[in-house]
Amino acid sequence: MSGQPPPPPPQQQPPPPPPPASAAAPATAPPGLAVGPGPAAGVPVPGLAAGSSAAAPFPHGDSALNEQEKELQRRLKRLYPAVDEQETPLPRSWSPKDKFSYIGLSQNNLRVHYKGHGKTPKDAASVRATHPIPAACGIYYFEVKIVSKGRDGYMGIGLSAQGVNMNRLPGWDKHSYGYHGDDGHSFCSSGTGQPYGPTFTTGDVIGCCVNLINNTCFYTKNGHSLGIAFTDLPPNLYPTVGLQTPGEVVDANFGQHPFVFDIEDYMREWRTKIQAQIDRFPIGDREGEWQTMIQKMVSSYLVHHGYCATAEAFARSTDQTVLEELASIKNRQRIQKLVLAGRMGEAIETTQQLYPSLLERNPNLLFTLKVRQFIEMVNGTDSEVRCLGGRSPKSQDSYPVSPRPFSSPSMSPSHGMSIHSLAPGKSSTAHFSGFESCSNGVISNKAHQSYCHSKHQLSSLTVPELNSLNVSRSQQVNNFTSNDVDMETDHYSNGVGETSSNGFLNGSSKHDHEMEDCDTEMEVDCSQLRRQLCGGSQAAIERMIHFGRELQAMSEQLRRECGKNTANKKMLKDAFSLLAYSDPWNSPVGNQLDPIQREPVCSALNSAILETHNLPKQPPLALAMGQATQCLGLMARSGVGSCAFATVEDYLH
């Protein structure tokens, strides 16, 4: 740099740690997207308010701006997948509050221009980015384009910690690092530079790469690496740029556009290095013990999720014993299949039959299952509304209008129910014209005939009539069919399989097979047809409404007996909100109808069943994965950059 910089202020203290994300920068600094080389080429693009990772609102109807912001999000996510921006936001622009007064910002705080006198080094001015570089980046990179070198080209590009004096070029003070354009020197916390690279001027693109794994930094010029400039860098550094003479203008690219330098290739090199280190982790003489432990973890995982045949085969091949009886695994497997198929009523009844005291001891779990059953009724997938979808005119008019009463646990199931016995199979049986009986989807002979008769008339139905059919039910069932062989060979009689640990309901109903055949034949290409509430059946809608009243009564009784439960209250409110929309599937609360929402319910029920066998609620393999994920998060918070290239997902095949 021509001329030595002025001495730093006396008694310069080490910079304080960066402020939390919520206070790191003012809310008035809206970063944006990259701009063109000239003043007229830039397009103002609102981005994130400084200190926040939530996107700022765009002008209504401006699809181009929305698309640019989406592209920025995609690029940053691809470059830095391990970064949680809710916790550690990425730099996206320069901070209008963390700069010297001679610095001017424009074009969404991505363009920097000098507006001072520029007579002496005391007129130098710098600006920091809105946020420090997160360690979870592993490798971080940004570029600066020299729009104009101005009078003398006294420009510095680099890094600095929070609190470093902004009346200086980067690199002149402690915890400050810079590469200067007029002489090509690098400045490492000192006013004396070291020869490093070529000078840079108007039109050049200078990149700065921070390696948070080995704590080094190198620069690039027009896409070519210039080699290591700094080592032993401290954590929590901010991208920084400094100017000193009139006319100097630079533009920043924090990921708004593709970089000139191929930073992704450099990242791939380091990912390979980190993964090789993991693969070479020494086990020593404990390899046999290590393998045995892993085999037990895999076996327990298969048992936990009900992969019965696979668990048996794996146990044989590894000389292990399966901790849970196979009959018990199959029972859990049947229940899981029912839940994942949306047949909640049958799942509840099967659970009551196989594990009589389970839901009685867990009223909140029962309530969760019943709320999910209500959602499946809306969806048209639960058996209690599916069996009403035969479109018999009489059946739509003859459903009893009084809901099943709640009562004490001592009452007979045929006369009432309490929150401890709220299973459809234990309720009073409703009778319909055209159906002999329909309780929890177990349809008698006449009901089955009526149901399947409608299938044979399917080809002659009009579009409005087809709209009343729940065309998505069979597709959802198929989507959640287990890959395990045993899952495919189980047969149902009232939701309970051929074999049972407590010995009842051996053998499957002939009508169940016919029912499944009937369902299969009803799989038609109706993707263009709009779904309707409860499959469009009036009787099913009435049943759903009465069930909702029962659910409300159950909620009130739970509150009286067990106290207030905010989660239960919100769950019920969200479920009832589905009825406020003519098309619940495309409503703001429609995500509840997504089949994937069945999985947490299935997991909770499965864990509760396992606890009755004194088995862990979660498989050890899942706990180990969770612990590894938490460790990676701790590494990121501790500034260990290698966590960026050691994701758990890389080892899940």
Swiss-Prot record:
Membrane topology per record: Peripheral membrane protein
Per the record, the similarity remark reads: Belongs to the RANBP9/10 family.
An example GO CC term for this entry is: plasma membrane
Sites of N6-acetyllysine modification: 330
Alphabetized UniProt keyword annotations: Acetylation, Cell membrane, Cytoplasm, Membrane, Nucleus, Phosphoprotein, Ubl conjugation
Kindly give the SUPFAM superfamilies that the UniProt entry links to this protein: Concanavalin A-like lectins/glucanases
Q: How is it modified after translation?
A: Phosphorylated in response to stress.
Q: Where is the composition biased (Pro residues)?
A: 1-21
Q: Which residues carry this modification: Phosphoserine?
A: 402, 412
Which Gene3D superfamilies does this UniProt record tie to the protein?
2.60.120.920
Q: Which GO terms describe its molecular function?
A: small GTPase binding
Output the superkingdom of the source species: Eukaryota
**The name this protein goes by in its record:** Ran-binding protein 9
* Principal location: cytoplasm
Q: Where is this region: Interaction with FMR1?
A: 539-653
Q: Where is the composition biased (Low complexity)?
A: 22-57, 398-421
Q: Which InterPro entries match?
A: B30.2/SPRY, B30.2/SPRY_sf, ConA-like_dom_sf, CRA_dom, CTLH/CRA, CTLH_C, LisH, SPRY_dom
Classification from the root reads: Eukaryota, Metazoa, Chordata, Craniata, Vertebrata
**Region feature (Disordered):** 1-62, 386-422
Annotated SMART domains? CRA, CTLH, LisH, SPRY
Compartments, record wording: Cytoplasm; Cell membrane; Nucleus
Record text about domains: The SPRY domain mediates the interaction with MET, AR, and CDC2L1.
| Every CTLH domain range | 328-385
Residues in B30.2/SPRY domain copies:
72-259
